[in-house]
Amino acid sequence: MKKIFFLLACVTSVAIAQKKSDREDTIIRKHAVQSFHDLQEILRIPNDAHFPKDIEKNIQWCETAFAKRGFITKRLETPTVPLLLAERKAKKPVKTVLVYLQIDGQPVDSSKWFQESPWTPTLKEQATDGSWKVINYDRLYENINSDWRIFARSTSDS
């Protein structure tokens, strides 16, 4: 009997610990919505690794985006395209967080995409027959539906 109560207490405490407050949910949604414009913007920039000029445009976009967020960026030159190091120091550092971001993509065959262009982020929802139907991208700014998907080249990497 003691084991049952112990297990019940553990399960209940885990469930309570995982629940987000309404305030946290509001903050998360606010920042998610604010990020949709940036996501759409970077997905519109071709990033085929075989074209250094495309990668340069992506690096420039990242430099600007990081600078807006208080990061200092530094290019690390390589024999091909530069790497970008972005750093933001905390006032009272406790731990270091390292995030790896990949901005180059593989070549894409545009004829195999079921939309205008792989470089045009397109919001879709799944129909009852399993196909994906285009919906207005601006709907993301009004409401977030976790069943919607953004289709564009490199979306899963961004």
How should these model regions be labeled?
Residues 1-20:
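Bacterial Sec-dependent N-terminal signal peptides
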